[in-house]
């Protein structure tokens, strides 16, 4: 039987870096893909350069790969994700990749938000690709919330969506789950993954400001339209799948320490 080789797209991102670390610890040969200049190889990690948007370099990057963990996403230009998906799937077929594990977001099918529609379309393309697949939806990563609050706090007041619940789940724990899924058999849509506690977005912002030593007023703002209604209806959380362990408070403690 040939050796399992995992390729990680979006390998320099918040989640991708964690996936690399977890795969390396598991002793699995891992290939890290970036569209920028490849980094020097680490023990157990080989860096490759390829561009999902154009398809350049994908055939070489996927050569010999058995499983792809797809973490790449263009949040600034989300429409680019769809041609990226098509290039990824075409190259994966040519390379004979046997399993694609995709990370998605809890609520993408419940909230009519433009970026979420793109995520749903990506899930559909994967499911109809003919390539064995697994799809995991997760709630919000603390590191991304930290970055978002950092941007919002540049203003005199911090505006957050009103009556909107969030459920931060540690990105490292999600990475562990993705590697576990990649080493298993394709499972289709698997149970969602949420953090251990649910919070109002305003409370998350206030606790972040306190932990960072920042003084700002937090102002909840009602988001109009169907997307806002979806946020207020709890579309971003998954109480029945609160399987995460590390809390938001524990994450903030590590940020204070640094």
Regions found by a protein language model. Give the residues of each.
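Glycine-/Pro-rich loop/turn segments that contact NAD(P) or position catalytic residues
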Residues: 74-153
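Short-chain dehydrogenase/reductase
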Residues: 9, 82, 112-121, 164-172, ...
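A conserved pocket-lining segment of Rossmann-fold NAD(P)-dependent short-chain dehydrogenase/reductase
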Residues: 147-169, 173, 185
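Residues at the starts of beta-strands that form the adenosine-phosphate
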Residues: 4-5, 29, 98-99, 132, ...
């Amino acid at each position: 039987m040939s050796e399992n080789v995992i390729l990680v797209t979006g390998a320099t991102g918040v989640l991708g870096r964690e996936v690399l670390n977890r795969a390396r610890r598991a002793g699995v040969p891992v290939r890290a893909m970036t569209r920028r200049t490849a980094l020097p190889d680490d023990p157990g990690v080989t860096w490759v350069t390829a561009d999902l948007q154009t398809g350049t370099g994908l055939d070489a990057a996927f050569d010999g790969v058995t499983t792809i963990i797809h973490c790449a996403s263009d949040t600034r230009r989300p429409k680019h994700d769809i041609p990226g998906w098509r290039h990824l799937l075409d190259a994966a077929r040519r390379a004979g990749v046997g399993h694609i594990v995709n990370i998605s977001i809890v609520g993408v099918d419940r909230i009519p938000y433009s970026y979420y529609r793109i995520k749903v379309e990506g899930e559909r393309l994967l499911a109809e690709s003919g390539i064995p697949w697994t799809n995991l939806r997760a709630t919000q990563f603390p590191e991304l919330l930290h970055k978002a609050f950092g941007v919002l706090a540049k203003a005199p007041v911090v505006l957050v969506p009103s009556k909107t619940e969030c459920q931060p789940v540690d990105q490292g724990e999600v990475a562990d789950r993705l590697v576990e899924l990649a080493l298993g058999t394709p499972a289709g849509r698997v149970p969602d993954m949420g953090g251990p506690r649910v919070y109002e977005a305003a409370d998350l912002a206030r606790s972040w400001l306190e932990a960072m030593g920042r003084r700002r007023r937090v102002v909840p703002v009602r988001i109009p339209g169907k997307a806002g209604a979806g946020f207020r209806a709890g579309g971003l959380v998954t109480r029945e799948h609160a399987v995460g362990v590390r809390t938001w408070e524990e994450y903030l403690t590590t940020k204070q320490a640094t």
